[in-house]
Regions:
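Alpha-helical transmembrane-bundle signature of multi-pass membrane transport and export proteins
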Residues: 1-419
């Protein structure tokens, strides 16, 4: 089949466009919230509460979200959560326009975090119903690529709109929130056009046993457990993005404009990788490809840690984004293909919990190590940042070796297209 055969699937194409529109709006909202909170409070702690306000509902709602995704129409869950996201976004619009107290912003973010927690497992588990198994890996590649594209376009569009609106409007963030609300409504309209439906064979009662079925399945399936563990620890140890402001100002001397480019470099690399993957045959040794991609991620992270040249640093982060995209495609494909449909929602919820918390904790870990080996020990802050990034890259490589030895099934896994 051709590289773009999956796009001839009407339902998948509608799903893909809806995902891009929704992701674009969410990326814009994330930037706008950070900008408005800092403008109003000038507090780094206020920015820290943004992640916390979305992480708390994710941890609290993960198990119920997985159970709901396995026992109710996944399409309807996506539609309902899109409406909730739209309402929360319009709530932020009002709060920003009237300059309401900051805690109201956090309340809306808690609602958004809860809606996303229910949306993710339903959306992930719904995708296998839209395409045949032979095209699923390509579908995941396109889905990942559109998300990364929104990660590049969203902040850029948001920044440009805020810069323009700031000259003529006292509440530019309100416009961004309204646009995200419209994007969520557009996603609702697009998903409602999808003809295929997830049919629940038999609803399972809400119980501790059924809620924990996703965790039990993950820990019983060695390949899924190994892939989730690999990605979780790699993100926890190898993430350099939280320290990019230090690199841009103290090490590379590139300032705010350079910081913007550095933040865009990983999504750019991921999009480029997605384009390459769509034009080549499916991975023949998916397990080995994932292990090697994470190992290269660690090596590129180490090299970035030592780099003092801006464009070399940009290129190394782009490499990180590219190989991370390979890992994401393989992991997501394995999780969905190896999980029975009646458990896909709960397993997807567990997957999102591990990855989501590792993203948040990874930033905290990087900052803690940088502070410990920087100012706490009397060294420049740049020294602490370099030690944090390089040690994280080394830790990532050690994780790859450990996973390959503990779960040899991953090394032996072949094609993702079911052939």
């Amino acid at each position: 089949m051709g590289s773009y055969a999956v796009l001839r699937n009407r339902d998948f194409l509608v799903y893909l466009i809806g995902r891009f529109v929704a992701s674009l709006g969410q990326q814009m909202l994330s930037v706008a919230v950070d900008w408005e909170l800092y403008e109003r409070t000038h507090s780094a702690l206020a920015l820290g509460f943004v992640g916390l306000s979305q992480m708390i509902p994710m941890v609290a709602c993960t198990l119920p979200a997985g159970h709901v995704a396995d026992n109710f129409s996944r399409k309807r869950i996506i539609l309902m959560m899109s409406l909730v996201l739209a309402l929360a976004s319009f709530g932020l619009t009002f709060i920003s326009a009237v300059n309401a107290p900051v805690p109201w912003i956090y309340l809306c973010l808690v609602v958004i975090g809860a809606a996303r927690t229910f949306l993710w497992p339903a959306s992930s588990a719904f995708l296998p119903h839209l395409v045949p198994r032979s095209l699923f890996a390509r579908a995941v590649t396109f889905s990942s690529g559109t998300f990364q594209l929104s990660s590049v376009a969203g902040p850029a569009v948001c920044g440009a709109l805020i810069a323009i609106m700031s000259r003529h409007h006292s509440h530019p963030a309100a416009l961004i929130y309204a646009l995200n609300g419209i994007a969520s409504l557009a996603c609702f309209g697009l998903v409602s056009l999808i003809r295929r439906e997830h049919i629940v064979a038999a609803k399972q009662p809400l119980s501790v046993t059924n809620l924990g079925a996703g965790f039990r399945f993950v820990f019983e399936n060695k390949i899924i457990l190994g892939t989730i563990t690999l990605d979780m620890l790699a993100v926890l140890l190898g993430g350099a993005t939280s320290l990019l402001p230090i690199y841009a100002k103290e090490i590379l001397g590139s300032g705010a404009s350079g910081l913007g480019l550095l933040r865009a470099s990983m999504p750019i690399g991921a999009v480029a990788c997605a384009l390459v993957l769509t034009h080549r045959r499916p991975l023949q040794k998916a397990g080995r490809a994932m292990l090697w991609s994470v190992a290269v991620f660690g090596l590129a992270t180490i090299a970035f840690g030592f780099s003092k040249w801006f464009w070399l640093s940009f290129a190394l982060l782009a490499v990180c984004g590219a190989v991370d995209n390979i890992s994401v495609v393989v992991r997501h494909s394995l999780v969905q293909l190896l999980t029975p449909d009646e458990k896909r929602g709960r397993v997807s919820a567990v997957n999102s919990l591990f990855i989501g918390t590792s993203n948040e904790l990874g930033g905290a870990e990087s900052g803690f190590v940088a502070q410990l080996f920087g100012r706490t020990m009397g060294n420049p802050v740049s020294t602490g940042a370099v030690i944090s990034v390089v040690s994280g890259g080394i830790g990532t490589i050690l994780v790859v070796i450990a996973v390959a030895l503990i779960w040899p099934q991953i090394r032996k896994y072949g094609r993702l297209d079911g052939a």
